[in-house]
Amino acid sequence: MSKLFSEYKLKDVTLKNRIVMSPMCMYSVENKDGIATDFHFAHYVSRAAGGTGLVILEATAVQEVGRISEFDLGLWNDEQVPALKRLVDGLHYHGAKAGIQLAHAGRKAVLPGEIVAPSAIPFDEKSAKPVELTKEAIKEVVADFKRAAYRAKEAGFDVIEIHAAHGYLIHQFLSPISNRREDNYGGPAGNRYKILSDIIKAVKEVWDGPIIVRVSATDYAHGGLQLEDHIPFAKWMKADGVELIDVSTGGLVNVEPPVFPGYQVPFADEIRRGAGIATGALGLITRGEQAEEILCNERADLIIIGRELLRNPYFAKEAAETLGETIEAPKQYSRAWK
């Protein structure tokens, strides 16, 4: 059997294969209320029908002020749970496990009114200047991640991913470019890591399932985080109980990264080897043979597919064919899926 189509365990959750749908914002909430719509149901469940092992929902805000836009999903109140439960049930029907990415946009929120950040430094010259979070407000953010995790459990999710990448709030704390604080949340790396550690520990108080963290392994900027900074972060995450690190890059400052097939895989490889923690690789992985090579050479443990799954919900089926595998079709499609 190919490695791509072997089972993989995240704590007590067994994935049927190692293909993961990357969380990707769809900006498709209709009433600015954070509630998932029929679009979200069709969008995510179709990828489960196509054979994806783990489907991770897009950035889901833990606070209303923490949305990237007014059209983002949310889990800051109980009214948002039922639509997500329906969606989770749909994913489970097709044999996929359900994940959700909990997030806070921080200074990258594009919303009316006040936005917040670790320091009063805007994302760029066109962005609003954020208000520096007080210690009390930081504790409330941590508490809201915990509340959102409890709601995720109520909705039936199998996996929680904490979004600490792409320039959003937790990443803003991690990077010295955006964190100029002089208290115990700023300065040395251990202080800058504190909010993420606090969030992981708070989530674990109400959630006994696997936790993934998405990071940006480089800021692509002078004075920012580089790969070597993420080795201690990853070791601390492992000690805090994180099962796997989803390794992306960039997003903290407004620069275009160099992009080519598999361009982020070396970062996943180095963090995996340097910190002794499982990683997920992503970034222009578009073919089954490419995914198989990454796994067979132990460069990562899971393959996280983004835009290729937007183009092709049946990526898993086609990857199986190229690797000489046969995967079970949804019974409704079996007459055509040979």
Swiss-Prot record:
Q: Name one GO cellular component term.
A: peptidoglycan-based cell wall
Which PANTHER family does this chain map to?
NADPH DEHYDROGENASE C23G7.10C-RELATED (PTHR43303:SF4)
**Entry-linked HAMAP family:** NamA (MF_01614)
| Subunit field text | Homotetramer.
Entry binding sites for FMN: S22, P23, M24, C25, A59, Q101, R214, G306, R307
**Which InterPro entries is this protein grouped with?**
Aldolase_TIM, NADPH_DH_bac, OxRdtase_FMN_N, YqjM-like
Keyword Nucleus on this protein?
A: no
Per the record, what are the reactions this protein catalyses? A + NADPH + H(+) = AH2 + NADP(+)
> What organism is listed for this UniProt entry?
Listeria innocua serovar 6a (strain ATCC BAA-680 / CLIP 11262)
Q: Which Pfam families match?
A: Oxidored_FMN
- Per the UniProt entry, the Enzyme Commission number(s) are 1.6.99.1
User: Which cofactors, by name?
Assistant: FMN
Which protein family is named in the record?
A: Belongs to the NADH:flavin oxidoreductase/NADH oxidase family. NamA subfamily.
Q: Upper lineage ranks?
A: Bacteria, Bacillati, Bacillota, Bacilli, Bacillales
The protein's name is: NADPH dehydrogenase
Per UniProt, the keywords (alphabetical) are: Detoxification, Flavoprotein, FMN, NADP, Oxidoreductase
Query: Which domain of life does this protein belong to?
Result: Bacteria
